[in-house]
Regions:
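Catalytic alpha-helical scaffold of carbohydrate-active enzymes acting on polysaccharides/glycoconjugates
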Residues: 1-147, 152-192, 212-232, 239-304
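Short, glycine-/Ser/Thr-/acidic-enriched flexible segments
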Residues: 199, 237-239
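Positively charged, amphipathic and often flexible ligand-engagement surfaces
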Residues: 193-208
Length: 304
């Protein structure tokens, strides 16, 4: 059966110390591989309050309890409390996960800063943020990162070329339908994109337009119908918290259906040498507020 790659975004200080560890325990118990992508700089989650003015954000807040998932203290970081430096204070936790055999990679330096700023940023800003994250990862793990997954699926036109320059081997920054090489200006990048292909659990909570009322049943129906390679993104703060039971049920059901569960490294190892060339554009995803980096249809007229 086609594989499902599991990508775990770890956004916060609390998520690194608590949610990521719960997920590692569950995955180890079930003998399932997954990729953990860490935020490596300061936790400024509280500064995300400005998103309250973004269309669709308040609807998501009503469907999913932000306080329950993140905790009051986390929501004060960067506003009423100084943001703890995740890379410096959580290195032992991160190395512990890598030591248990899980793939680890870069999510971001400052999650809120990247998610809210990269879309309008220039090359120097983007280079600085990526370099800070790469260097902190190298300090924590003693080796350079191989994989990058952008915070909030937010990018700009400089990211693919900088990933190539900074030594990343593959990335999962986008939403889409399958692996591709990003079209640059000019040419085509060499760092494959492995886009998230499935909706996240929090994008499905409380919606009335699903194949099944329960988000887990909806995901099972979608993956059975599509029967293709998939990338599923989850969050340490959500599936490593209140959604842990739902995530375990999803994993067990996929296993019962003979789906191979793997990490991004295992998925990337299966790639052919003839990936489609696609532009990365701005688009929307049901259940997620704002615009995201989305895979456009393949281009046949672009060469390296």
């Amino acid at each position: 059966m086609s594989p499902i790659a599991l990508k775990i975004d770890v956004d916060t200080y609390r998520g690194t110390r608590e949610g990521a560890m719960r997920l590692a325990d569950l995955l180890e118990r079930l003998d399932v591989r997954a990729t953990f992508l860490f935020s490596l700089g300061p936790d400024h989650t509280g500064r995300a309050i400005k998103r309250a003015f973004r269309r669709g954000f308040l609807g998501k807040v009503k469907r999913t309890s932000v306080v329950q998932h993140y905790g009051v203290k986390t929501l004060m970081y960067g506003v009423l409390l100084p943001g703890p430096h995740i890379g410096r204070r959580c290195g032992e936790f991160m190395r512990g996960i890598a030591g248990r055999g899980f793939e680890v990679g870069v999510h971001t330096w400052d999650h809120v800063r990247w998610q809210d700023g990269v879309g309008q940023a220039g090359e120097p800003w983007t280079r600085r943020e990526l370099t800070l994250a790469r260097d902190q990862f190298t300090e924590v793990f003693g080796r350079a990162p191989q994989v990058h997954g952008a915070a909030g699926w937010q990018m700009n036109r400089y990211v693919p070329a900088l990933q190539q320059e900074l030594g990343f081997r593959y990335a999962s920054d986008t939403r889409g339908t399958g692996p591709f090489l990003p079209v640059l200006d000019p040419g085509v990048g060499t760092v494959p994109q492995l886009p998230t292909t499935l909706p996240t659990l929090d994008e499905l909570i409380g919606r009335s337009d699903l194949r099944a009322p329960d988000p887990v049943d909806h995901l099972l129906a979608v993956t059975a119908e599509q029967a293709r390679d998939e990338v599923f993104t989850l969050h340490a703060e959500l599936e490593g918290g209140v959604y842990l039971g739902a995530f375990e049920r999803l994993l067990r059901a996929w296993r019962q259906r003979d789906r191979q569960l793997t990490d991004l490294a295992g998925y990337a190892a299966r790639l052919s040498g003839n990936l489609p060339h696609c532009r990365i554009v701005s688009g929307t995803v049901a259940g997620r507020s704002g615009h995201l980096a989305v895979q456009a249809p393949a281009r046949a007229d672009v060469t390296h």
